[in-house]
Amino acid sequence: KWNYYSLKTMKGKKKMKRSTIKLTLFLLCLCLGSYITASTGDRHITKSELPMTAQNTIGKHFKDRNIVLVTKDNGFMDKSYEVVFNNGDIIEFDSNGQWKEIECPDSKMPEAIIPQKVREYLKKKFPRSLIRKMERHGLKYEVELDNGVEIKFDKNLNVKEIDH
């Protein structure tokens, strides 16, 4: 037999059950977030712990520079590596060892690492400028010159955008 008191008690139990489920989900998310935060972040490694492709890039294009720091960033979705040289140059590699970004703030970018079509364009249009930063996004490139000009190249290495 249903009465007012039994209906009110059932509603209270349902509210309590929902509150318990919400609290459990909140605590689960909190624990998962803590785990993810603890398992990500930078860790110092040695050059020999870099992927072989990254080691080859350094040996071929940056052999005259001394490494002062190598880090592995265990991101949530992927990992990356960063190599810092004693002259301030920095290379960032993806998880496979392919370079993603090269910064040469006070030195000349190694010519052999710059795609030939990009080199030719820069020699023709910006003959006195040096590349300070170069990024690679798949087959697309972006360069930043010492005069502040940024140039984006498409996958065929044609100029797509110039920012002054």
Regions found by a protein language model. Name each.
Residues Y5-D42:
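Bacterial Sec-dependent N-terminal signal peptides
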Residues T40-H164:
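Interaction-mediating elements
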